[in-house]
UniProtKB/Swiss-Prot annotation:
Protein function: Deubiquitinase that specifically cleaves 'Lys-63'- and linear 'Met-1'-linked polyubiquitin chains and is involved in NF-kappa-B activation and TNF-alpha-induced necroptosis. Negatively regulates NF-kappa-B activation by deubiquitinating upstream signaling factors. Contributes to the regulation of cell survival, proliferation and differentiation via its effects on NF-kappa-B activation. Negative regulator of Wnt signaling. Inhibits HDAC6 and thereby promotes acetylation of alpha-tubulin and stabilization of microtubules.
PANTHER family, per database record: 40S RIBOSOMAL PROTEIN S3A (PTHR11830)
Ranges where the USP domain occurs: 592-950
KW Metal-binding (keyword) present: yes
Enzyme class: hydrolase
This protein's name: Ubiquitin carboxyl-terminal hydrolase CYLD
Gene: CYLD
Mutation effect (S439A): Loss of phosphorylation
Effect seen on changing S441A: Loss of phosphorylation
Catalytic reaction equation(s): Thiol-dependent hydrolysis of ester, thioester, amide, peptide and isopeptide bonds formed by the C-terminal Gly of ubiquitin (a 76-residue protein attached to proteins as an intracellular targeting signal)
Length: 956
């Protein structure tokens, strides 16, 4: 299909606009008037009829032998004017236009358009109607009530109609809005109980409990539509594959014994298509001279052509509403007559058989070897003669498949966030459908893939200018039929090429694709047969997300239609963390952990550390509200318990929408601001949440000598750098800090959160810190029995000045029994030391501690929060083994560009265990760049280390 004119200039003065709308019946290839490059408008696009002011009508005068053309302003591209042949469009009324415009995927829009019954019922859906909503393909439909019907964004001449639905019963909590869209309250319902959807996600619950047909109706689903019979000798058109063929009506009536199916039409085609002999079930329906170009179709598959009288009128003709393309998808199992090229019963011929018949072959015959169709990929935005494939003139262009290429239908969930790709199927030499022997990447820019060994150091990627704003991480498409969709993983210019390429990662394997290599050089890494390389200028932003307008307010974006595919569950039942193998199976993978959004990594990683595999703070989730608590105490606690912690432990995933709800609550505190948008520190978050909102009993009670007990939730290590120390342990750092500040724990903590010595986020006091798996805090507790550092008896005195003495247990806190203390301080260099008595329980019998019976107070490391370049990630321990470590990043991957979505990921990192077995000397001498996997971040970027008491976790 081609057009006569394409203008990117704003359509104001040259044309009159009328409220008449048309839908394209097939993809249109057009030329940009300014750049002379080829552009495409997909099948299913909707245009508004315009008139040329200068001549009083909208048609380009036809050349000899050519038909008139209709002027359209494409609604999805409001500054574009397109002139198309009348046979390539069908008129639709304004009400249907509004319903269809809300469906952003043109292919799905076209499928719904063909289902007249379903579309007509959409007009009946109004506020108050009971409906069922399909949130995710393959899952149950949730009941609901329509609370809003209308446009979400009234920016065009005509706007798409969306339905705001309040979900009921089991659907409650499965939505993503409370009726607010971009700051406007369009209807009211409880939070997460509402959705905004287009008609294709909706089913009207009728009195007889029969719902609307499915999104892709089978061939029989629309046969009940009553259309008037066509006149004999009238001109008609029909869709064959991707082309429109014309012919003359020679028969129009019901079939004997099939009256309930409505009218069938016999057509004498202009081109040799079909071989119907005028008979059905042994009955001669009509007679004609030639049977080499005749077919029999249901009337719903026929597009009435324009009459001569109508073509002379100013207004373009009103074409038949229903245009069921014979090559389009549909059920192949319905036993209803469609078309036949022989005397066989059309009631026993399926849609695939019909496609064979229309291409001039019997169902059982081999497909034709020649075709006028071109089965290679044209380069988008360039002259069609210059294809992406750069195929030479002697390229063997096999005939197209005689069955339409299957198109992967998009799940509701995929339409929001995943990579719902459709792969173009290419014909094999025998005519069967198969993947292309060379992927688009291979055909577009190179001769052979296997000409050089894989290099590990690829050329540097470059950020070229791109008018479409595409970047690494953007969802992009290469517009073909069906299109290629992918996420851009790399952009740059390989050696020897003058073109800037984009490397896309596909979801489904495609023959000829690689695992991220191109011409033997690796540019990114993905699964085998999923890496596709194309010219960057051939890529466009993913058109399926065109209606998801950029939301300037990223806070409200969590409540927009875009996040519908990322919803997580609500779990009321209190759930302990799953440990060892069970926890590993739940937690690892992509879209696992807590989804990051808009500077939330500090909060995501902190919550994951505290609750994913530890119950030490679970009492925070259970304390009943008291009279002194803030008014939103219960709301916060319930949100944490049922929408964050419990779902994380059962399903391993929490969406950003839930975290944004918590961030909004944090901003209610007078002392807090910026929690919904700004980068924050974990300690600031913990202080607001624990102290101001939940009023958690302080985790730590610390006393400085002779002072009152100080309450806090975490401990920040302050100290001067010791150049003699290469790699300190957490044990050493904590003891140094307590000794230098003369501090003691007033009581043993159940949870100890230690903040590493830093100056701000960036400057680290030590290049590496060894996270002690076990922390002995016995010597840091007051009123606790302690062992003599020399004899092991009950210590009575402690000397801070002996701490650095290398002759006595270097690097250890020094406390001695009465006898050993006297002996130690007889040495000349210790004569002037000032030692202090150790505080002991008043009722402690001295004899109980004489023979090494003094217990130790140990704490276990359960999580480490790390930071690098202002981005927080987490390491958590899921089991007893030293290698039982998981790494969590709430923004590990990206689905789309600036207005895309973060994909959280949890990955096992058993290599951590091997490094924690190394000596401190070996770790110190080890180049950080040689540390494998995630272990480098654990050893080099630790920000907070979290310990729990194995015996006291139930009490605090």
């Amino acid at each position: 299909m081609s057009s006569g004119l394409w203008s990117q200039e704003k359509v104001t003065s040259p044309y009159w606009e009328e409220r008449i709308f048309y839908l394209l019946l097939q993809e249109c290839s057009v030329t940009d008037k300014q750049t002379q490059k080829l552009l495409k408008v997909p099948k299913g696009s909707i245009g508004q009829y315009i008139q040329d002011r200068s001549v009083g009508h909208s048609r380009i005068p036809s050349a000899k032998g050519k038909k008139n053309q209709i002027g359209l302003k494409i609604l999805e591209q409001p500054h574009a004017v397109l002139f198309v042949d009348e046979k390539d469009v069908v008129e639709i009324n304004e009400k249907f236009t509004e319903l269809l415009l809300a469906i952003t995927n043109c292919e799905e829009r076209f499928s719904l358009f063909k289902n007249r019954n379903r579309l007509s019922k959409g007009l009946q859906i109004d506020v108050g109607c009971p409906v069922k909503v399909q949130l995710r393909s393959g899952e149950e439909k949730f009941p609901g009530v329509v609370r809003f019907r209308g446009p979400l964004l009234a920016e065009r001449t005509v706007s798409g109609i969306f339905f705001g639905v309040e979900l009921l019963e089991e659907g409650r909590g499965q939505g993503f809005t409370d009726g607010v869209y971009q700051g406007k309250q369009l209807f009211q319902c409880d939070e997460d109980c509402g959705v905004f959807v287009a008609l294709d996600k909706l089913e009207l619950i009728e009195d007889d409990d029969t719902a609307l047909e499915s999104d892709y109706a089978g061939p029989g689903d629309t046969m009940q539509v009553e259309l008037p019979p066509l006149e004999i000798n009238s001109r008609v058109s029909l869709k064959v594959g991707e082309t429109i063929e014309s012919g003359t009506v020679i028969f129009c009536d019901v079939l004997p014994g099939k009256e309930s199916l409505g009218y069938f039409v016999g057509v004498d085609m202009d081109n040799p298509i079909g071989n119907w002999d005028g008979r059905f079930d042994g009955v001669q329906l009509c007679s004609f001279a030639c049977v080499e170009s005749t077919i029999l179709l249901h009337i719903n598959d026929i597009i009435p052509a324009l009459s001569e009288s109508v073509t002379q009128e100013r207004r373009p003709p009103k074409l038949a509403f229903m245009s069921r393309g014979v090559g389009d998808k549909g059920s192949s199992s319905h036993n209803k007559p469609k078309a036949t090229g022989s005397t066989s019963d059309p009631g026993n011929r399926n849609r695939s058989e019909l496609f064979y018949t229309l291409n001039g072959s019997s169902v059982d015959s081999q497909p034709q070897s020649k075709s006028k169709n071109t089965w290679y990929i044209d380069e988008v935005a360039e002259d069609p003669a210059k294809s992406l494939t750069e195929i030479s003139t002697d390229f063997d262009r096999s005939s197209p498949p005689l069955q339409p290429p299957p198109v992967n239908s998009l799940t509701t969930e995929n339409r929001f966030h995943s990579l719902p790709f459709s792969l173009t199927k290419m014909p094999n030499t025998n005519g069967s459908i198969g993947h292309s022997p060379l992927s688009l990447s291979a055909q577009s820019v190179m001769e052979e893939l296997n000409t050089a060994p894989v290099q590990e150091s690829p050329p540097l990627a470059m950020p070229p200018g791109n008018s479409h704003g595409l970047e690494v991480g953007s969802l992009a498409e290469v517009k073909e039929n069906p299109p290629f969709y992918g996420v851009i993983r790399w952009i740059g210019q390989p050696p020897g090429l003058n073109e800037v390429l984009a490397g896309l990662e596909l979801e489904d394997e495609c023959a000829g694709c690689t695992d991220g290599t191109f011409r033997g050089t690796r540019y990114f890494t993905c699964a085998l047969k999923k890496a596709l390389f194309v010219k960057l200028k051939s890529c466009r932003p993913d058109s399926r997300f065109a209606s998801l307008q950029p939301v300037s307010n990223q806070i409200e974006r969590c409540n927009s239609l875009a996040f519908g595919g990322y919803l997580s569950e609500v779990v009321e039942e209190n759930t302990p963390p799953k440990m060892e193998k069970e926890g590993l199976e739940i937690m690892i993978g992509k879209k696992k952990g807590i989804q990051g959004h808009y500077n939330s990594c500090y909060l995501d990683s902190t919550l994951f550390c505290l609750f994913a595999f530890s119950s030490v703070l679970d009492t925070v989730l259970l304390r009943p509200k008291e009279k002194n608590d803030v008014e939103y105490y219960s709301e916060t606690q319930e949100l944490l318990r049922t929408e964050i912690v419990n779902p994380l432990r059962i399903y391993g995933y929490v969406c950003a929408t839930k975290i944004m709800k918590l961030r909004k609550i944090l901003e209610k505190v007078e002392a807090a601001s910026g929690f919904t948008s700004e980068e924050k520190d974990p300690e600031e978050f913990l202080n607001i949440l624990f102290h101001h909102i939940l009023r958690v009993e302080p985790l730590l009670k610390i006393r400085s000598a002779g002072q009152k007990v100080q309450d806090c939730y975490f401990y920040q290590i302050f100290m001067e750098k010791n150049e003699k120390v290469g790699v300190p342990t957490i044990q050493q750092l904590l003891e140094w800090s307590f000794i230098n500040s003369n501090l003691k724990f007033a009581e043993a903590p159940s949870c100890l959160i230690i903040q590493m010595p830093r100056f701000g986020k960036d400057f680290k006091l030590f290049k590496k810190i060894f996270p002690s798996l076990e922390l002995n805090i016995t010597d840091l507790l007051e009123d606790t029995p302690r062992q003599c550092r020399i004899c092991g008896g009950l210590a009575m005195y402690e000397c801070r000045e002996c701490y650095d003495d290398p002759d006595i247990s270097a690097g250890k806190i020094k406390q001695f029994c009465k006898t050993c203390n006297t002996q130690v301080h007889l040495h000349p260099k210790r004569l002037n030391h000032k030692y202090n008595p150790v505080s002991l329980p008043k009722d402690l019998p001295d004899w109980d501690w004489r023979h090494g019976c003094i217990p130790c107070q140990n704490m276990e490391l359960f999580a480490v929060l790390c930071i690098e370049t202002s981005h927080y990630v987490a390491f958590v321990k899921y089991g007893k083994d030293d290698s039982a470590w998981l790494f969590f990043d709430s923004m590990a991957d990206r689905d789309g560009g600036q207005n895309g979505f973060n994909i959280p990921q949890v990955t096992p990192c058993p290599e951590v265990g091997e490094y924690l077995k190394m000596s401190l000397e070996d770790l110190h001498s080890l180049d950080s760049r040689r540390i494998q996997g995630c272990a480098r971040r654990l050893l080099c970027d630790a920000y907070m280390c979290m310990y729990q008491s194995p015996t006291m976790s139930l009490y605090k």
